[in-house]
């Protein structure tokens, strides 16, 4: 009977876990729909912005703005984005592995690397290994363009002042609910805006601008960094909630399987106990009959 009580206790514990994972799945699903809507709503603006900037960038020389100026890379800065919370499968671990691999490759090339983590998980991991610059945590659950502007301001001025020579952004690109792929994007300098916009040359519209091209690109280039960072934040948010939803759904199914296994085990133990009791009764009856 002690074995039966142990199994019943395990079933009850798994049932409680299942209730938690199911609730977390529902919460993640709701947050995912919200973050996915934000991400998809921002895409048309981002694409049109990059289209306009693309048509403008090909008309100015690389020395028209400091953000276009390429120089020999000696020191780089890496902005890496993760979630603040866990329980989202391999979402953060794949991002951290990609970031660490990229940083090690650059160090092996003889470059100095400054790391700027955005999100608690990536910050907690790298603070034990590297000196961090302008790290941020507890910002991914609720954010707007203001956060993207703040991050951009932290990285643009040091680049213009030649404190570092290249800026890279590493984040989880949203593919679908069950797939998020780490992406490495060079943000600064910006010699190939047209490639990022994915616009074929023959389809690019040639606009007439007022004021001059140089004045306008001076206004738009910082905004371009804002747009890229905000897009990465939105994709990170959607990917995190999608990954958590998938992870909690998988955990709920695992609970169902465990409950089925424990229930079968319970029935077997109970049947064995009943059989043993019946054998004792039959044996006692036969002994009385002979006596």
From Swiss-Prot:
It is found in: Cell inner membrane. NCBIfam families: ATPsyn_F1gamma. This is ATP synthase gamma chain. One of its GO terms (biological process) is proton motive force-driven plasma membrane ATP synthesis. It comes from Syntrophus aciditrophicus (strain SB). Belongs to the ATPase gamma chain family. It comes from the Bacteria. GO terms for molecular function: ATP binding; proton-transporting ATP synthase activity, rotational mechanism.
């Amino acid at each position: 009977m002690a074995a039966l009580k142990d199994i019943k206790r395990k079933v009850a514990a798994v049932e409680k876990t299942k209730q938690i994972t199911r609730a977390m799945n529902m919460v993640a699903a709701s947050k995912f729909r919200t973050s996915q809507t934000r991400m998809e709503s921002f895409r048309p603006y981002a694409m049109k912005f990059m289209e306009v900037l693309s048509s403008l960038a090909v008309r100015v020389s690389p020395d028209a703005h400091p953000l276009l100026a390429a120089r020999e890379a000696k020191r780089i800065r890496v902005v890496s984005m993760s979630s603040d919370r866990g329980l989202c499968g391999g979402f953060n671990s794949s991002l951290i592995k990609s970031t660490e691999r990229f940083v090690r490759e650059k160090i092996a090339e003889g470059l100095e690397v400054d790391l700027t983590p955005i999100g608690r998980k990536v910050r907690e991991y790298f603070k034990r290994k590297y000196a961090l610059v302008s790290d941020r945590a507890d910002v991914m659950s609720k954010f707007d363009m203001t956060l993207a502007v703040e991050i951009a301001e932290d990285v643009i001025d040091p680049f213009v002042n030649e404190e570092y020579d290249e800026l890279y952004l590493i984040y989880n690109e949203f593919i679908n609910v069950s797939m998020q792929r780490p992406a490495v994007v060079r943000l600064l300098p910006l010699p190939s805006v047209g490639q990022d916009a994915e616009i074929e040359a023959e389809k690019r519209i040639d606009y007439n601008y007022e004021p001059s091209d140089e004045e306008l690109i001076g206004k738009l280039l910082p905004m371009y960094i804002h747009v890229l960072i905000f897009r990465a934040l939105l994709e990170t948010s959607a990917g995190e909630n999608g990954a958590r939803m998938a992870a909690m759904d998988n955990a709920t199914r695992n609970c169902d399987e465990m409950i089925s296994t424990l229930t079968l085990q319970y029935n077997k133990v109970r049947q064995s106990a009943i059989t043993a009791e019946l054998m004792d009764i039959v044996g006692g009856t036969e002994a009385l009959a002979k006596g």
